Each structure stands twice: as C-alpha cells, then as structure tokens.
Design a protein with these regions (language model features):
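Short helix-loop boundary/capping segments
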Residues: 165-237
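Extracellular-facing segments of soluble proteins and assemblies that are Gly/Ser/Thr-biased and enriched
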Residues: 108-196
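Solvent-exposed N-terminal domain segments of exported/luminal and surface proteins
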Residues: 42-102
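Bacterial N-terminal signal peptides
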Residues: 8-18
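Sequence contexts marking disulfide-bonded cysteines in secreted/extracellular proteins
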Residues: 18-20, 55-57, 78-85, 101-103, ...
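N-terminal secretory signal peptides that target proteins for export/translocation
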Residues: 1-5
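Ser/Thr-rich, Pro/Gly/Ala-heavy low-complexity intrinsically disordered linkers and tails
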Residues: 19-42
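Long, compositionally biased interface segments
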Residues: 218-283
Length: 283
C-alpha cells in the first residue's frame, strides 16, 4: 500500500492437498498506533457464527476460515475519526460504511489477508512459501466502490516478498511490496515511473519507490491498470506480475512469498466499499 502497511484480513479458505495447494474462498454475500500497517494491537476475534459483526475498532480482525478480515485503520493519527465495517463472519463479505475525510493521505486498508503480515497470521495458511517452489498463483475477486467524482481511493492487491521466512510474523519487511491497482480515482503512482507493461490481458503503468519505516527499508512496486477500471477479476494470473517484478530485480528466486492481501486504500470517500467474493489458488 502507498506509505502504509498491513493489517490482518482475509476470508474462508478450503485447503486441497495434491499436486498443489488450492485456496478458494467461498462466495460471500454482498450485504453485509501509529506505525503504518503493523496492525497494532488486538488479537484476532472469534465471534458467534453466522452473524453480521458491526465494528468501529481501529484494528478489528475477524477470522473466517483460513483468512482474516481486518479494518486496519493504520494511519488514524493523521486522519482522526472513525471507520466502521459490517462483516459477515460466516462468509467474509464486508462493507465499509463509515470513514472520515483524509484528503490526499492514505489512512486505512480494510482488506483480506492470506498469510502472515506484521505479526498477524491467517489460520492454516500455506505461506510463507519459497518463490522457487511456486508454479502458479491466481486469484478471483469481486468488489464494489461508491462515492462521487471527487473521491480519492485505490482498490488493490498488496503482496509481500522477503529474503527470509519470518518477515510476516516478526514485523517490518526488507524485501518487496507489490501492489496491483484494479480501481482507483484521483490518485497516481509516486517516485519513479518505469513505463508500461502488458500482463494478463491489460496494460499497466509501473511505479517503484522505496519505503522506510522505523529504520526498515523495502521496495514498493505498483502496477496501475490503464483504461477502464474494473470491479472484478477472474483467475488473475498473479505469477505474471511476480515474474515481471523479478525481471526488474525486485523479487529474487530465493525469497519467500509470505502474504497476499486484497483491499481498499481509503483516503476520501469511495463509500460504501464492498468486498463481495474472493479466492486464491497457489500451486
């Protein structure tokens, strides 16, 4: 995420053994600190099943199968106010119903997490996984964004790589954060524009920057979709992005993939934001 880091969010997952790991997230209904992305404080919560959890907690984290759904209002200090969500704890569908006006500042990343990130781990995850052992990673995702033409947001995957297998459980990374922006408004990339690339049927603007938080540095690589924005992808080939990042020197074969997140970097407006269905397959 732009100048932000993670939370703990995700959804129900089915583990299938065999030649690879498949983690499809069940279809889910469409209704419902100061250190960025650390997911600061608060253990994952087990709620009564088959209920809608309404929460305005800064770092709400609800386990759903092998995923976690998180609020991750990581930059509340820069954007005082309240963020509220309605989460279906049986399916993982969620809606962000309230969020303050934060201007140009990324303040929150309500998302789904599979893997480990900043000390939060989804139950039963197969990550971290060596990049060298990955054949394919695909994902399907459906979401909805409301608001008006002046709102600012980006809906994106946030995918994390690290030279060792403990980054996600021990805090800040020192590898690469790879974002895939599927839908955004009144925002752009930052630092260095590397050009464009065609991947999985779309053209993407590629941006790179360096993140530095609490003495920890890592690469930030963003792929921003050109042309019409989308609100769903089906079997998006994430490995195509991994390979492109590797060709640019930002992912190493000896590193580990340790987290896949999908959410909305909230700034101003864009509500209601709904996450409707999500799945990941790793082989």
């Amino acid at each position: 995420m732009m100048n932000c880091i993670i939370a703990r969010l995700a959804l129900s997952l089915l583990l299938v053994t065999g030649c690879g790991l498949q983690t499809p997230l069940d279809q889910f209904a469409s209704n419902p600190s100061d250190n960025p992305g650390t997911g600061g404080g608060g253990a994952n919560t087990t709620w009564p099943q088959n209920v809608t959890v309404n929460t305005c907690e800064q770092y709400a984290a609800v386990n759903v199968g092998s995923y976690v759904v998180e609020s991750d209002f990581w930059n509340q200090r820069s954007c005082p106010g309240t963020q509220c969500m309605a989460i279906n704890d049986a399916t993982g569908a969620f809606t962000v119903t309230q969020f303050p006006d934060c201007g140009n500042t990324v303040a929150s990343y309500p998302n789904m997490l599979y893997g480990c990130s900043f000390g939060t781990c989804s139950p039963g995850s197969a990550l971290p996984k060596p990049v060298s052992s990955i054949t394919t990673v695909t994902s399907s995702w459906s979401f909805g964004v409301g608001g008006v033409a002046t709102d600012q947001y980006d809906v994106a995957y946030d995918i994390w790589f690290c030279p060792n297998n403990t980054c996600g459980s021990n805090g800040f990374p020192n590898g690469t954060e790879l974002m895939i922006w599927l839908n955004y408004q009144n925002v752009t990339g930052w630092e260095s524009h590397l050009g464009t690339v065609s991947l999985d049927g779309h053209t993407w603007d590629v941006w790179v920057a360096t993140q530095a938080v609490s003495g920890n540095n890592w690469n930030y690589l963003a792929y921003m979709i050109q042309g019409p924005m989308v609100t769903s992808v089906t079997n998006l080939d994430l490995t195509a992005f991994f390979k492109d990042a590797a060709s640019r020197g930002y992912v190493q074969n000896s590193w580990y993939l340790y987290a896949i997140q999908a959410g909305d970097e909230l700034r101003t407006g864009g509500l209601p934001y709904d996450s409707n269905s999500f799945s990941v397959s790793i082989k």
